[in-house]
Amino acid sequence: RFMLRRARFKIDYLYSGDKMPIVFFALQVDATERGVVVRDMYGQLIDHKWKKISLFMGLFAKPFGFETNLSSGSRESPERGRMNQILFPRERDMGVMLNYHSLLNQGAWYDKIKVSVGLFNGSGLYTTSEQDNYKDIITRIQYLQLKLSPKLSLSAAASGYLGAIRSNNEQVYKFKNTGLSSTNETSNIGKRIDRKYYGADIQLKLKHAWGASEIRGEFIKGVQ
């Protein structure tokens, strides 16, 4: 059997004024024998005065954790880690996000801070319509490349995910000492089910004669 694991095509457009970016558009599709799926379709507006604040609108990756936003071109393996695949099987969603990150790195400590706050549908990449009125709030705060020595740098971040979905059936699943169990409760229909995640990640990078080596760690805890 022959098949295509990935066949992605991306186009983007950047409009600049006074040699600085102002507007950015991106469209990415994944076309395989199973069909064509839009993976990215968003616009980014960048403030022209301070060049620190930008607004994302459309379909794009959720700003939670390190590996969720690490593109396939930057990963050492074709797939993301198992933990990330379970919690975020479709790492993209429709929404709007406000981002703070200085485009003019003048060496100040605050130029290395990146803050993202987004509001998303929560229904994921492949859902054609919103399933409920709940929205997911996702935040991420990063400090990029703190110099520990001329060759050693440290990056760290914390993420938060506050969301919910609507239950459409009577089944309730719970983990107990004996394992996973389920019960039928009529009150569960239409009930709000919380999704709350909290995460932290760290990356230690060492430059050497052959390039650079990096150690990464990520921890996520929450309720699903």
Language-model features: locations:
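Outer membrane beta-barrel
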Residues: 1-125, 131-138, 142-149, 160-162
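Active-site-proximal beta-alpha loop/turn segments in soluble metabolic enzymes
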Residues: 118-128, 176-185
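Detector for outer-membrane/organellar transmembrane beta-barrel domains
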Residues: 151-224
